[in-house]
């Protein structure tokens, strides 16, 4: 049996390392099969029942590099063009009939690549026919998953309904606001969607809150804060978009982001400074030790090598300082869809 996990193309090694660690924490051991640039990793495990237990126990929102995932019996090759459904249906029955009686629905996934996107129409077509052949029950805790790699190869599998990303495949469906000064604005919006439940936006992202944006220019992240009717100190030596400055909600502080300290604690700190991740993590920890914010969203620009280990080091760096300070907190990281060679962190002080 295999755990198939999708990721950003180029981060297969990081995903493989994360899967090894996460499954081992839950007493499941196996080995990853990963190839650079394919956009997914197969984690092979001997005991299928244990793997199903594991995917049901791991908290999906705590994973960093996993965009989406499911359990499968392995890729099926040689799917005939005149009947792709039967081999997929047969493997589903053989692999899961002893563990899962029904699924609530069948999801259609594609690898986030040009080749994967080109298969989306075929996946929907095959999936619509396959769905009618599967044992469906709306009350089931499991979902079926179909992922085609080509016209003749693909996966059929299952995943728990409650261990899912907000968007299928982890591909955030957000519309770029024309008024925003840069496309980086979508990173902060996606971060809020990922880290903050929709039911809590009105209280945790409330009008008249005070915020600081470090590395603000030209104002992509500041725009999101202003759109939530917050008052923002935009900290950057570079110029801000003039339209952002017209409404009176933004104060431009032309100083270095690492040197700035707020005169009073604020509700939100956001930071998209391009610097060494350890330096950014150190700054976030300092702000947290001083209780200068309630919540923070920040980006860590990752090095070319040992990127997974760098995330772990930065997490430990922040956590050790918070534990020493006796602070109650929640810290999470995620490589969002709109992230590139980076991950986004969220720190909530309690």
Curated annotation (Swiss-Prot):
GO-annotated molecular function: S-adenosylmethionine-dependent methyltransferase activity
Catalysed reaction equations from the record: cytidine(2498) in 23S rRNA + S-adenosyl-L-methionine = 2'-O-methylcytidine(2498) in 23S rRNA + S-adenosyl-L-homocysteine + H(+)
Among SUPFAM superfamilies, the record links this protein to:
S-adenosyl-L-methionine-dependent methyltransferases
Subunit annotation = Monomer.
Q: What does this protein do?
A: Catalyzes the 2'-O-methylation at nucleotide C2498 in 23S rRNA.
What family is it from? Belongs to the class I-like SAM-binding methyltransferase superfamily. RNA methyltransferase RlmE family. RlmM subfamily.
Instruction: Provide the protein name.
Output: Ribosomal RNA large subunit methyltransferase M
Taxonomic lineage is: Bacteria, Pseudomonadati, Pseudomonadota, Gammaproteobacteria, Cellvibrionales
């Amino acid at each position: 049996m295999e755990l198939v996990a999708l990721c950003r193309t180029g981060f297969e090694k990081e995903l493989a390392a994360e899967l090894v660690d996460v499954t081992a924490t839950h007493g499941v051991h196996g080995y990853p099969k990963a190839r650079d640039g394919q956009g997914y990793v197969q984690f092979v495990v001997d005991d299928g029942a244990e793997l199903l237990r594991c995917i049901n126990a791991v908290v999906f929102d705590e994973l960093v590099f996993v965009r989406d995932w499911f359990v499968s019996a392995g890729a099926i090759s040689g799917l005939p063009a005149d009947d792709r459904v039967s081999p997929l249906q047969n493997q589903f029955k053989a692999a899961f009939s002893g563990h899962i009686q029904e699924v609530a629905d069948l999801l259609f996934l594609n690898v986030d690549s040009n080749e994967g996107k080109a298969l989306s129409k075929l996946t929907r077509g095959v999936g619509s026919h396959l769905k009618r052949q599967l044992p469906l029950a709306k009350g089931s805790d499991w979902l079926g998953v179909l992922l085609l790699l080509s016209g003749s190869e693909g996966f059929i599998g299952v995943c728990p309904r409650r261990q899912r990303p907000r968007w299928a495949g982890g591909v955030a469906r957000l519309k770029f606001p024309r008024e925003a000064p840069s496309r980086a604005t979508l990173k902060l919006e996606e971060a809020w969607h990922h880290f903050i439940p929709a039911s809590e936006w009105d209280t945790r992202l409330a009008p008249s809150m005070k915020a600081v944006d470090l590395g603000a220019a030209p104002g992509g992240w500041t725009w999101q804060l202003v759109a939530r009717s917050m008052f923002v100190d935009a900290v950057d030596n570079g110029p801000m978009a003039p339209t952002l400055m017209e409404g009176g909600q933004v104060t431009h502080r032309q100083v270095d982001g690492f040197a700035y300290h707020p005169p009073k604690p604020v509700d939100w700190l956001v930071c998209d400074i391009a610097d060494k991740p350890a330096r950014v993590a150190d700054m976030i920890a300092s702000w947290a030790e001083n209780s200068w914010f309630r919540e923070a969203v920040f980006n860590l620009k990752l090095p070319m090598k040992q990127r997974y280990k760098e995330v772990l080091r930065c997490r430990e760096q922040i956590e050790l300082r918070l534990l020493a300070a006796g602070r109650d907190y929640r810290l999470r990281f995620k490589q969002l869809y709109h992230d590139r060679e980076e991950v986004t962190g969220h720190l909530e002080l309690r």
